[in-house]
């Protein structure tokens, strides 16, 4: 598993779990910003993405073992976890994991999907047609779903700007405003390029993992020991806000924050504030917390 560490070397460790498709190089606060916040940010490529070896038939719950292995390798005893978009379910896996109990201090989840088999949730309600097709909703033909992702991944690997252009055709007005920022566009296309340069398998295996049971119980999350905060943009049509509300209802004691007029990519802007909550819930958000450049720039 490939990982990178940015920010303050002696800061509080926070694992950042990327979206789908994504990589460890995805959008994050600048290195100097993380340093000032006292955050040691650890990001890694899920198996099959970037420089990480593929692990076929993985489940969402397997992310807890990846995080545990990296934490052990780095000598990190306690840490927080934040997952954005497709990283959200994987972050919740860490919160629920028995072996990580006492090690995971807080968990934040931004614009996450709910489980495929969520009871009393219209899983596709409010979701754009591209995502409905990409997840193979209504299709029992796994091979056809894999082929759809493979074709999209090959096209994106050849030119990552094409994937973002495809997404823009179905974005809400809020998301179009967000990706009008050239710096954010560059970060998004760069992470797509890194994610897919070794093949489509990370993306394929993410989707297959989302289509099967997550292999952990949301109700097992003890928010008294590991506080959980969920954030969602009200206008998200990639992972509709109903998914976030459903998750919050399944996790006793979880906090849910919905931002009116915001959508999926606004989660990037929210990340510094969420990181502040993860490392120091009583601290005020500094005015100098900026997004938009690679770590260290």
Predicted regions and their residues:
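Conserved HGGG/HGGXW glycine-rich cap/lid loop of the alpha/beta-hydrolase fold
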Residues: 2-51
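Catalytic active-site module of serine/aspartate enzymes centered on a nucleophile-bearing elbow/loop
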Residues: 253-297
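Short beta-strand/loop motif that positions the catalytic acidic residue
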Residues: 224, 230-232, 236
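Conserved acidic catalytic loop of the alpha/beta-hydrolase fold
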Residues: 62-80
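Glycine-rich His-Gly loop
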Residues: 16-20, 85, 112, 233
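Conserved alpha/beta-hydrolase "acid-adjacent" motif
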Residues: 237-243
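Alpha/beta-hydrolase
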Residues: 129-217
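Conserved hydrolase catalytic core segment
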Residues: 78-123
């Amino acid at each position: 598993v490939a990982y990178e560490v940015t920010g303050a070397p002696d800061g509080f460790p926070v694992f950042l779990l990327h979206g789908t498709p994504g990589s460890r190089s995805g959008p994050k606060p600048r290195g100097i910003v993380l340093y000032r916040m006292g955050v040691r940010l650890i990001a890694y490529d899920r198996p099959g993405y970037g420089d990480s070896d593929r692990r076929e038939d993985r489940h969402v719950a397997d992310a807890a073992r990846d995080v545990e292995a990296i934490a052990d390798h780095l000598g990190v005893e306690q840490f927080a976890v934040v997952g954005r978009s497709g990283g959200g379910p994987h972050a919740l896996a860490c919160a629920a994991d028995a072996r990580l109990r006492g090690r995971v201090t807080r968990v934040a989840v931004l614009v996450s999907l709910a489980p495929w088999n969520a009871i009393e949730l219209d899983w596709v309600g409010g979701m754009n047609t591209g995502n409905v097709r990409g997840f193979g909703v209504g299709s029992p033909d796994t091979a056809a779903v894999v082929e759809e992702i493979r074709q999209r991944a090959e096209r994106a690997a050849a030119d990552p700007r094409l994937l973002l252009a495809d997404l823009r055709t179905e974005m809400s007005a809020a998301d179009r405003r967000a990706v009008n920022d050239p710096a954010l566009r560059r970060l998004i296309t760069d992470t797509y390029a890194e994610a897919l340069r070794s093949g489509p398998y990370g993306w394929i295996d993410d989707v297959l993992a989302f289509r099967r049971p997550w292999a952990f119980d949301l109700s097992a999350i003890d928010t008294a020991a590991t506080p959980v905060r969920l954030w969602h943009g009200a206008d998200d049509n990639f992972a509709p806000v109903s998914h976030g509300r459903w998750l919050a209802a399944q996790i006793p004691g979880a906090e849910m924050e919905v931002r009116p007029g915001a959508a999926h990519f606004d989660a990037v802007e929210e990340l510094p504030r969420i990181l502040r909550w993860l490392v120091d819930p009583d601290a005020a958000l500094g005015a100098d917390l900026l997004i938009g450049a690679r770590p260290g720039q």
